Amino acid sequence: MEELTVEVRGSNGAYYKGFVRDVHDDSLSISFENNWQPERQVPFSDVRLPPSADTKKEIGEGEEVEIFSRANEQEPCGWWLAKVRMMKGDFYVIEYAACDATYNEIVTFERLRPVNRNKAVTESTFFRCSVPVPEDLRAACESEQAHKEFKKAVGAIRIVYSPEKSELVVLSLSEATVKRVSLLSDIHLRSIRTKLMLMSRNQEATKHLESTKQLASAFQEEFTVREDLMGLAIGSHGSNIQQARKVPGVTAIELEEETGTFRIYGESTEAVQKARNYLEFLEDSVQIPRNLVGKVIGKNGKVIQEIVDKSGVVRVRIEGDNDNKLPRQEGMVPFTFVGTKESISNVQVLLEYHIAYLNEVEQLRLERLQIDEQLRQIGMGFRSVPNRPADKEKGFGPDESSSGSIHTQRSYRGRGRRGPAHTSAYGTNSEHSYTSETDSERKAELSDWSLAADESERNPRPQRDSRRRDLRGRGRGSRGRGASNSISSVLKDPDGNPYSLLDNTETDQTADTDGSESQMNTSRRRRSRRRRTDEDTTVMDGMSESDNASLSENGLVTVADYISRAESQSRQTNPRDTRKSKKDMTRGDFISEHSAAESVSNGPNNADEPSESAKAVVNGVS
């Protein structure tokens, strides 16, 4: 920058080049060329202005001139007063006095100049003014280059910033400069502020350019986030971006808000990918089978809430039937999740596992239902073929047992009650039980045919069907007729509905004394048995006749009727026949009772030890 140059007189009388730094009341702050002397204050009397540049250089012999020379090697060159002694071509012989000595020297014209006629400066030679600088502009005003245009505009010789006083010092040789400074100082400071801001932006842009050039060869990731998910990606007050920038190895993150594009730069692929996981939010749907939607949601949304919490997704939306935003598969319901890419992957894994678990549970449930159905079919399926006489003789034990196993809460009996420890023969599906029941039925059937004539004379009510009831039941009361008739109907039509026992039982309990029903059931019982000879009557026939005869006038059968009937028959029958009939009846009842118990317990056949209850019933004790 152009300096205010002056000439300072030294102690040897030579004038040396110097620069004015500041103006004081009676002196100037002067700095010297090449700093051969330190900056110091010089009085006005020792300072003069240099000659103007347009001064004519016409030198002749005998004239006084000034020579640019030095007295010794330690001092710089200065202007000394000299005299031309001789001229020869471009060379001059000069004589000058220095340090109390006279020197002669041959020099060229460039080292000579006419004598400087400028006098020493005074207080009025220089004009000084100052401009206060705001605090935010002090650093910018330290550079003299910032005042280049201002100096030119005001016509100042020098403008410098004084850190001690925080002001701009303007030096000039004209008084007009002071007026111009007062006019342009505010504009100059404002322009400095604007230029400072622009320079700052330029510096940032330059740094960004340099960093971009460096990052261009580094690792980077670029992805786009939907406009409606930008808020989640940025986070509250930019928390997600700040968290991504704190990832070790991430150097820069750029965001184009117009397009929703993120650019992540880093030192490694792992660092860039980790930062991307914080910022990349998306929406994805998972297809759930319609029959599993309720189980996936859970009671009060407990299951789906647990899945959301564990996966880390932001929210979940279940698409309705009327929503057509997403493609829908047949029989499937879309579950739409919003979250980071990692959380979406987590929720897909959780749902796939949960659906697989629900399918396995459903498969196990179906297998259980199939097993139960097979058990029912096994219980109902051992029906005898009508064309095989052997099966007819064995009876239909499995049908009766299956009906008992299906309706476990209801017992298929009439009015008579049984003990709580009694187990019906209809309730087992065991092969041993079936075999023992068949054998006992054969024995009971033989005993029934052998005792048919005697039982027709005696009371037939307790001997109605020894295979289908417990001997203990005779002492407590007779069973309803409906149960015997219903069982007879099942025996007659094994291919029919075995559950008709329930209907017949209910009917017999409500209308037990219906005469027409009794006659119809009697005819069924008669047809259900095969006679061995045409002359013999079956046990069912005898029981049917006795049943018809035992009806009272009002159609009800009481225990007293059985007791009185038994006493009257015992009086009419001789003791020998009575003992014989009792003995035969006991033997037949023992066989049938033992077979029923065997079918229930599936234990060994203890036919040789009749129960005490059977004896008690035979003796007529209830």
Swiss-Prot record:
Keyword RNA-binding (UniProt): yes
SUPFAM superfamilies noted in UniProt: Eukaryotic type KH-domain (KH-domain type I)
SMART domains (UniProt xref): KH (SM00322)
Region feature CC2 domain, mapped onto this chain: 353-379
Chain residue ranges for the region called CC1 domain: 201-208
Modified residues (Phosphoserine): 447
Disruption phenotype: Morpholino knockdown of the protein causes abnormalities of striated muscle development and abnormal development of the heart, including failure of looping and snapping of the atrium from its venous pole.
Gene Ontology MF terms in the entry: molecular condensate scaffold activity; mRNA 3'-UTR AU-rich region binding; mRNA 3'-UTR binding; mRNA binding; translation regulator activity
Agenet-like domain location: 4-50, 63-115
UniProt feature, compositional bias: Basic and acidic residues: 455-468, 574-596
Compositionally biased spans, kind Basic residues: 410-420, 469-479
Domain comment, as recorded: Disordered region at the C-terminus undergoes liquid-liquid phase separation (LLPS) for the formation of a membraneless compartment that stores mRNAs. CC1 and CC2 domains are required for homodimerization and FXR1-network nucleation. CC domains also mediate interaction with other proteins containing similar CC domains.
Full protein name: RNA-binding protein FXR1
Organism name: Danio rerio
